[in-house]
Structures are given as structure tokens and as C-alpha cells.
């Protein structure tokens, strides 16, 4: 997975910070977005992030995922 790849959320991930559903449970399963970052290092040092894939969706919304929670969309 690289920055700029289109991905789809394949597993049930519930968030509470979606802009249209503030403070209520919202399931991201089936949503599509773009990989904004893959977190492997911080300040030049390697890290082992629990949720390393940062995905940007529409409407100024981003969320972190495990690699097995998203799949690439082939164009």
C-alpha cells in the first residue's frame, strides 16, 4: 500500500469522530478513500504503529486503519 492508492474499508470499523455523525457511532465499512500516509517512522526512527495506514475520505475526514481492514481498489 502506497500513498495515493485508492482503498475500501472491508471490515467493520466504528468511529465517533465522523463530521456528519459527531459523538454517535458510525461504521466505516464500505467507504472508499485515499491513503494519505503509511506510518513506519517518526523523527527518523522506526516505529511499530498499531494502526499504520492513514486514509483520507471526503469532507476533511481521516482515520487510521490496520492493513487488513482495507483493500486496494483496482482502477
Swiss-Prot record:
GO terms, biological process: photosynthesis
Q: Which UniProt keywords apply?
A: Oxidoreductase
Signal peptide span per the entry? none
Keyword DNA repair appears in the UniProt entry: no
Annotated spans, Interaction with ferredoxin: 43-46
What InterPro entries does UniProt report for this protein, alphabetically?
Elect_transpt_acc-like_dom_sf, Fd_thioredoxin_Rdtase_alpha, FTRV
Among SUPFAM superfamilies, the record links this protein to: Electron transport accessory proteins
Molecular function GO labels: oxidoreductase activity
Q: How does it assemble?
A: Heterodimer of subunit A (variable subunit) and subunit B (catalytic subunit). Heterodimeric FTR forms a complex with ferredoxin and thioredoxin.
Q: What does this protein do?
A: Variable subunit of the ferredoxin-thioredoxin reductase (FTR), which catalyzes the two-electron reduction of thioredoxins by the electrons provided by reduced ferredoxin.
* Annotated PANTHER family: FERREDOXIN-THIOREDOXIN REDUCTASE SUBUNIT A1, CHLOROPLASTIC, FERREDOXIN-THIOREDOXIN REDUCTASE, VARIABLE CHAIN
Family that this chain belongs to: Belongs to the ferredoxin thioredoxin reductase alpha subunit family.
Protein name (Swiss-Prot/TrEMBL)? Ferredoxin-thioredoxin reductase, variable chain
Higher taxonomy: Bacteria, Bacillati, Cyanobacteriota, Cyanophyceae, Synechococcales
The gene that this protein is the product of is ftrV
